[in-house]
Amino acid sequence: MNLQHHFLIAMPALQDPLFRRSVVYICEHNPDGAMGLIINKPLENLQIEGILEKLKITPEPRDPAIRLDKPVMLGGPLAEDRGFILHTPPSRFASSIRISDNTVVTTSRDVLETIGTPKQPADVLVALGYASWEKGQLEQEILDNAWLTAPADLNILFKTPIADRWRDAAKLIGVDILTMPGVAGHA
């Protein structure tokens, strides 16, 4: 099972404060483990504009149609000072990894320098930190009913309101997660 370019959708019984009702976009999954970004936990009082200001990046030429007040996500509990930018192609940046035909993750400053300009990728999600699982850990958590999985959907990743992403990601596989009981069993 390879879950790269899939969503992990937290089951209602998952009560860890960070992962409760979370949707994680899996950027990498291989025999050694997995890495992903939480896409529905905005950091309080931090927007893309604030990141650009902190890094002394001024978008030029500025495209006024591009909003810089979008929230920055808490991507996960590891390396919370490190930025990850999920975006649609192209991946012409210094440190980009193509996740799927339609999704790229970049960690280099050059992608931030395009945000707010006509050169910005069409869709962008900025996160600080990431989530990681060791070999076999994610598979075991899925067997333990901590997560549902669904193929990633770009609309949910980039366009769905943050508050709706958990519910809408579960709907991708026909699940109304709001009506699920808090404890799941094995059949």
UniProtKB/Swiss-Prot annotation:
Query: Cellular component GO terms, alphabetically?
Result: cytosol
Alphabetical list of SUPFAM superfamilies matching this protein:
VC0467-like
Q: Give one Pfam family.
A: DUF179
Task: Output the NCBIfam families linked to this UniProt entry.
Answer: PRK00228.1-1
What Gene3D superfamilies does the record tag this protein with?
A: VC0467-like, VC0467-like domains
This protein's source sits in the domain of life called Bacteria
Q: Which family does it belong to?
A: Belongs to the UPF0301 (AlgH) family.
The protein's name: UPF0301 protein YqgE
